[in-house]
Amino acid sequence: YNVARKNNHTGMEISAHFLRTIVVMYKGNPDKGFELFKQIRMIADNSGHELYKQTADLCIAFMYSYYNQLRLVEQWIIDGNPADMHIYTPLKPFYAIVYGRICIDREAYTKYMGSYGIMMQDARVHQNLISIIYLEIYAAISCDKLDMKAEAAEHFKEAVETAYLDGIVTPFVVNGKELANVW
């Protein structure tokens, strides 16, 4: 964080604050984490760049979604239509993760599946494995909830196969409760 701030790297500064927020919140101090959100917002707003403002919105929405605080998420993220939105290209994979989580939390499984194709296309173009894994996990959860068991199993299998080679487990741990019925 200090190196990013000293060298005026706004994107890195936001990322460092986001990682600090995750650690603080996972250690059981959500109040401190929510306070750090204000710093992320201030850094982004002071930058004057839309890219950093979108980054801050997504970082904050990511954490709010895991604390069932969707009322605090920016409306453009909740209402989003990934095919029609102007999201800066570097943010598309992260947007897909956040938007998918919000759809799962809101039980908007059909809406998620309607956006799945365009988000997966973007994730594959940018070769973003984490995004691909999350998209497949959210598709497995959505299909399971829509009583499409074979499709749910296929999406879960795809997520596992994609994650296996690089040993990526976090998306499965974070979504374990919702995945319990899929496997």
Regions found by a protein language model. Give the residues of each.
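Polybasic, glycine- and aromatic-enriched phosphate-binding surface used to engage nucleic acids
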Residues: H49, A56, E151
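A compositional/structural signature marking long, glycine- and acidic/polar-rich segments
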Residues: M85-F94, D105-N128
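C-terminal non-catalytic interaction modules
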Residues: K111, I118, V125-W183
